[in-house]
């Protein structure tokens, strides 16, 4: 397993013998999801989105009408910057401002696995069994940071979590904060859920993923026989 960073193309590549996960820093600000799947040797710099002026799409950079966050595959999307899909996080400061201004601000590549404080997580017996990429997003206006953690193992597994740090003096209300987000390229996907009842657990339900919202949850406070985690 290995984590590399290609400076010229601003591309992170997490990989082992089985899988690859590729992230690119776009416009020196935004994290774009490029690839997750079977192991590749290298992310080719020629594999890029075709940018053109799209109607009804907001442009965060006034000088470039071909670039819109609403059409990108995002790693950790925000609200209030022109991406009208579901955000990974939402906030409100004491002035009632809800616009997020977190931009890419560096990275670290670490040996081993970083454990999220107070949350369940997998473990390793030695630091040689995993590598972790830490990416920093910073809001310099409010003096806030979000740390994104990606850990790759010897097996075909990538685990993720996020951490919010308030470096400022003013309180911030966190209205929404997900552990991860994943945007996938347009294809025909199925949603697979496992539902059931007592002594009749894990009935498989499969349906096409359409242009809608699907929520799988349990109000029991734990995974139960009624609804198990989705795939």
Regions from the PLM with identified roles:
Residues 191-193, 203-221:
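Polar, glycine-rich mid-to-C-terminal structural blocks
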């Amino acid at each position: 397993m290995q984590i590399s960073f290609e400076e010229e193309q601003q591309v992170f590549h997490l990989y082992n013998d089985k899988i690859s996960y590729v992230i690119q820093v776009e416009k020196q600000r935004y994290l774009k999801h490029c690839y997750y799947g079977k192991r590749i040797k290298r992310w080719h710099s020629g594999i890029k989105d075709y940018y053109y002026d799209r109607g009804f799409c907001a442009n965060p950079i006034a000088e470039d009408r071909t670039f819109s966050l609403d059409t990108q595959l995002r790693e950790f999307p925000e609200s209030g910057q022109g991406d009208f899909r579901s955000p990974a996080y939402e906030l409100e400061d004491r002035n009632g401002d809800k616009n997020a201004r977190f931009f890419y601000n560096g990275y670290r590549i670490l040996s081993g696995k970083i454990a999220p404080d107070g949350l369940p997580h997998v473990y390793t017996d030695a630091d040689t069994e995993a590598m972790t990429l830490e990416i920093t997003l910073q809001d310099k206006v409010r003096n806030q940071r979000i740390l994104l953690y990606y850990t790759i193992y010897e097996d075909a597994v990538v685990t993720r979590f996020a951490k919010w740090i308030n470096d400022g003096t003013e309180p911030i209300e966190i209205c929404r904060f997900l552990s991860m987000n994943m945007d996938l390229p347009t294809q025909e996907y199925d949603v697979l859920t496992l539902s059931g009842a007592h002594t009749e657990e894990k009935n498989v339900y499969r349906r096409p993923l359409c242009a809608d919202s699907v929520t799988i949850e349990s109000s029991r406070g734990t995974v139960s026989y009624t609804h198990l985690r989705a795939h």
